[in-house]
């Protein structure tokens, strides 16, 4: 666990930003999509480096696409980067659609093992039941489970199998920082667009509400927020129409939290001169590229609420390959500001698109969260809404 506690935000950002570089292609079948990214050069490197503990890496996604420019891709770039650097063969496996079942996810694990993977990165909370099966079926395979906790795997007592390491994040802290910064920067009509109402998305959203409320109280103003889960991790005409309605009704900035669902918010924002907050990785480059290509009139991204996906995946792989699995076996690393700089907003000048909110103000509130002066509610139950003051009105829409 010490390896994780030693991470810095620089490492997190470097790996997260790697997601900007490319999107992998895939071949589809009726049940899954898989791609092998190994090359002859990688094989030669493997002989030189002697990768004895990991013989093959797989990333299995619970839902969505690989090139979502967010969660799935942030993890994949870490897997790909690790394989390229170490010379270890790596693959990815995708379910065939948004309605994939636990059995479909079990099939992906089975296929990954058949293809030679002995270390599998399972990405997404929905992988819990399939992991319970896979850990028993393949006791010699190491599973790194991102956004999965013990109760997702074992709903009776939360026990994590010895060949599984769970990685979760305190998304509520990143969401808080985004909401706080937005209101301090002058936005008073906010929106939260979630994908599916899964725990990580809920924590991001509820943190966003709490941060916006705190800033409104400090400023002595009233703010309004629209709040909605789109029940999917991709953008489409339905979600775009919903966002058109928000922006047309006065919403100034939307925190789009849910894989590729951001595309609908960005499309609507461009039509209405609105703004956007990205998620999981620094998504500012998407706005920059959109302007350069003529897709957007202006960069809609104000900031992004990030978590160290790439760093967590890389260090998990390092631990396996170093033969140190016993240090994390059967545990859940839950990472936030107390543990290190695992969550936050991008502070690089190119991505700092606030008008009045300063880096000093950001660092002040960040340290208050880190030292416990500010406590952010980490509720991940959609039925339990965060407690707020009269300074914020939240319209929870269905």
Locate each region found by the language model.
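C-terminal motif of bacterial Sec signal peptides marking the signal peptidase cleavage site
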Residues: 16-19
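A residue-level marker of the well-folded mature domains of exported/periplasmic proteins
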Residues: 26, 30-37, 41-398
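Bacterial signal peptide processing site
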Residues: 21-23
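Positively charged n-region of N-terminal signal peptides that target proteins for export
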Residues: 1-11
